[in-house]
């Protein structure tokens, strides 16, 4: 049997009947679950698909990153592109922490792989160090999620360690050529993707998205393929296999517990606020779970929920009086706008700002928040993807959902360590709808799995007094200890 290793797919060409039988047997043994929409039944159904596909020419093929599932290793064809000594002699090596050096060296032994590193571990520095280890004649593509503010933040850091002519960027209307091309995921089609011999993907949990997936499939000359994320997998079976297939397996992990023990992350006090709304109860809506009409649940129990909004406003009163800042994470623009209006009416106009993925000048707004120009930042999913907010010390998760990726990305925005800093996180256990309640349960499960502890607080009676008691007995006392 012939095996043709390529940077995207590995092909298996049977030369006789025995080879065909071996490959057919392999194909049956590497099967995964996949959700597919059934237009007749109008719902998603579980189907089983094989990782080892067959084309019309009876040639079998698999994404090269999935070779370990066939008990095979991808050849180390990247070694001629790597110079470890060059990295160790560079000034950036001295700035790296011990766990960063360990992760980088282990990753560089392989032509492809992922570093699973919790938020606040310095993934951008690891990416820069790997670029230093790659020889100077090798063109590198760095893929950044779609938000311009995140790309600008990355470019700014790179220019501290690389010469200006080395660094290029590609986003929106902005373009500059360079050996190290930092590109927004939405602008990849503008590039000649075959040109790059190394591809590094930040926030690689986004790889299954069509724009990034198609781009990585077109990077046929990229012998080096690395991914970085605090939550690289955990979407679904099918999407996880796409990520691994295009970038390789997780090679190294940097956990919250490791950073906490070494003092490289902020301590976290996580509260889950258990409540039931006092202004309405609808048995039909409690049992409601039709995803097509899901907006009704969101509007009733999130957007129009006066009790939930009151809890947020009471928390903000103590947060502001304690001279702390706060990030409020929302899922929908209308929720963010509504909270912004409520906060301005209850406090003052200049204390809060709302930003979303389509808000102009997001980077400037985040810098102003970080410098203390205003105290409360309300943001949508933009804030989940690597935005650097080192001074953030309080988070209110006003959104819903059960995704481990989203939850950990949100917490991660406040994990940047500072002397005397304690990160307070407030989450909700919504008891008015069974699906929302299930979402809360899933979030608690993910917290425990990732090494975070939490405390449940019941808010069933006098909201104002109970929030006051929570703040002075559980929050302020903890802050004094730090």
Regions found by a protein language model. Name each.
Residues 205-270, 447:
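Post-DEXD/H (motif II) to motif III coupling segment of the RecA-like Helicase ATP-binding lobe
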Residues 413-444:
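Conserved segment of the helicase C-terminal RecA-like domain
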Residues 124-126, 133-160, 332-334:
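Conserved Walker A/P-loop ATP-binding site and its immediately adjacent core
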Residues 290-331, 338-342:
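Conserved interdomain hinge at the start of the Helicase C-terminal
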Residues 110-132:
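Walker A/P-loop
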Residues 168-170, 174-176, 327, 337-338, ...:
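Conserved helicase ATPase core of P-loop NTP-dependent helicases/translocases
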């Amino acid at each position: 049997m012939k095996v043709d290793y390529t940077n995207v797919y590995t092909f298996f060409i049977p030369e006789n009947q025995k080879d065909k039988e071996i490959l057919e047997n392999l194909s049956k043994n590497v099967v995964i679950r996949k959700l597919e929409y059934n237009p007749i039944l109008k719902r998603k159904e579980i189907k089983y698909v094989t990782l080892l596909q067959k084309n019309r020419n009876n040639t079998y093929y698999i994404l090269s990153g999935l070779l370990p599932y066939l008990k095979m290793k991808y050849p180390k064809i990247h070694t001629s592109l790597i110079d470890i000594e060059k990295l160790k002699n560079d000034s950036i090596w001295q700035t790296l922490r011990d766990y960063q050096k360990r992760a980088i060296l282990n990753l560089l032994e392989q032509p492809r792989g992922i570093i699973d590193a919790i938020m606040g571990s310095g993934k951008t520095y690891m990416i820069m160090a790997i670029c230093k280890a790659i020889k100077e004649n090798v063109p590198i593509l760095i893929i950044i999620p779609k938000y311009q503010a995140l790309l600008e933040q990355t470019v700014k850091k790179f220019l501290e360690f690389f010469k200006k002519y080395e660094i290029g960027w590609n986003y929106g209307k902005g373009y500059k050529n360079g050996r190290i091309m930092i590109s927004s995921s939405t602008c990849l089609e503008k590039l000649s993707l075959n040109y790059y011999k190394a591809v590094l993907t930040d926030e690689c949990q986004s790889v299954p998205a069509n724009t990034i997936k198609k781009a990585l499939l077109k990077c046929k000359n990229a012998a080096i393929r690395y991914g970085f994320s605090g939550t690289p997998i955990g979407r679904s079976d099918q999407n996880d296999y796409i990520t691994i297939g295009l970038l390789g397996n997780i090679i190294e992990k940097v956990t919250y517990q490791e950073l906490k023990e070494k003092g490289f992350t902020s301590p976290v006090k996580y509260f889950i606020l258990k409540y039931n709304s006092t202004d309405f109860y609808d048995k039909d809506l409690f049992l409601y779970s039709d995803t097509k009409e899901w907006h009704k649940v969101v509007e009733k129990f999130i957007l129009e929920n006066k009790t939930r909004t009151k809890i947020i406003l009471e928390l903000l009163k103590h947060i502001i009086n304690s001279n702390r800042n706060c990030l409020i994470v929302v899922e929908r623009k209308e929720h963010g706008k509504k909270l912004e209006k409520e906060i301005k009416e209850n406090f003052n106009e200049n204390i809060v700002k709302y930003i979303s993925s389509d808000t102009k000048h997001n980077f400037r707004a985040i810098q102003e928040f970080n410098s203390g120009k205003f105290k409360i930042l309300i943001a949508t999913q933009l804030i989940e993807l690597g935005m650097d907010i080192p001074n953030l010390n309080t988070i209110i998760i006003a959104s819903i959902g059960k995704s481990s990726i989203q939850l950990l990305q949100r917490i991660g925005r406040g994990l940047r360590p500072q002397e005397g800093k304690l990160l307070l996180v407030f989450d909700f256990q919504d008891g008015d709808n069974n699906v929302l309640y299930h979402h809360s349960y899933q979030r608690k499960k993910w917290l425990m799995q990732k090494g975070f502890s939490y405390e449940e607080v019941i808010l069933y009676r006098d909201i104002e007094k109970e929030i006051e008691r929570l703040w002075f007995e559980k929050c302020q006392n903890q802050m004094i200890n730090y």
